[in-house]
């Protein structure tokens, strides 16, 4: 076990500390959680960031997409997670339909911040720049989600790898820079070629978190039910079962943190 995991974290994770991690080349770990007990365990295991994802619609509520999730759903689970986490950085998804206008986005983001979120995550490209600016100017930190954005599943025609053409890759790069200029603090990259994940991470100052975006992102994220192998159905390529060789979920969580920190996850078989 690495010395990182042997030492309990005493200081709260912050946006400046996450940026400092990118600058010194230390990988950031993020996992999803939906209740206080899992949040507390992840915090104890050294996970830097906990995401209350709209993935709760699929893994908790049993829907076949994230689209039915409401702002009230996310706020409820955010409050649960915030009570359990002591030092990890807590971030919440803005669910489908909750940020159609910048004013509506602010109103709903406030609900999540009041529930305990320290940052909100929104999906979308250049057209979200005004919303990002509107939120950050009003003291709400924002992570922007590019690549495979699940709320756009019907437009994509399914869950497909994005950014595979030179044109699509260049568009994503320009959008990342535009959103950073608008005030975005972090960038989540999902299901894109590993080479593009590397280029985007080098291009922007803000930390990047990857899920199926290669090993060169500033950090990685997985969904709770995926890394402990309890979500039924076909597993995405970027998922690894960290329960293998472990006797507890805590052990699996520590194994995930160690694998991200030492660069062994994601491996080539988890990348596009």
Swiss-Prot record:
Query: Entry cofactor note text?
Result: Binds 1 Mg(2+) ion per subunit.
Top EC category:
transferase
The answer to whether the entry has keyword Metal-binding is yes
Q: Which InterPro entries match?
A: Pantoate_hydroxy_MeTrfase, Pyrv/PenolPyrv_kinase-like_dom, Pyrv_kinase-like_dom_sf
> What chemistry does it catalyse, as a reaction equation?
3-methyl-2-oxobutanoate + (6R)-5,10-methylene-5,6,7,8-tetrahydrofolate + H2O = 2-dehydropantoate + (6S)-5,6,7,8-tetrahydrofolate
Any matching Pfam family: Pantoate_transf
Q: Please name the pathway.
A: Cofactor biosynthesis; (R)-pantothenate biosynthesis; (R)-pantoate from 3-methyl-2-oxobutanoate: step 1/2
Subcellular location(s): the record lists: Cytoplasm
Cofactors (names)? Mg(2+)
Q: What is its EC number?
A: 2.1.2.11
Asked if the record carries the keyword Metal-binding, the reply is yes
Write out the entry's keywords from A to Z.
Answer: Cytoplasm, Magnesium, Metal-binding, Pantothenate biosynthesis, Transferase
GO cellular component terms, semicolon-separated: cytoplasm
Q: Which residues bind Mg(2+)?
A: 54, 93, 123
Among the GO biological process terms of this entry, one is: pantothenate biosynthetic process
- Binding of 3-methyl-2-oxobutanoate: at which residues? 54-55, 93, 121
Question: Where in the sequence is the active site?
Answer: 190 (proton acceptor)
Q: What GO MF annotations does this protein's record show?
A: 3-methyl-2-oxobutanoate hydroxymethyltransferase activity; magnesium ion binding
PANTHER family, per database record: 3-METHYL-2-OXOBUTANOATE HYDROXYMETHYLTRANSFERASE
Q: Which NCBIfam families match?
A: panB, PRK00311.1
The free-text function statement in the UniProt record for this protein reads: Catalyzes the reversible reaction in which hydroxymethyl group from 5,10-methylenetetrahydrofolate is transferred onto alpha-ketoisovalerate to form ketopantoate.
Q: According to its UniProt record, which protein family does this protein belong to?
A: Belongs to the PanB family.
On assembly, the entry states: Homodecamer; pentamer of dimers.
UniProt xrefs under HAMAP family: PanB
| Protein name (database record) | 3-methyl-2-oxobutanoate hydroxymethyltransferase
The protein's organism comes out as Janthinobacterium sp. (strain Marseille) (Minibacterium massiliensis)
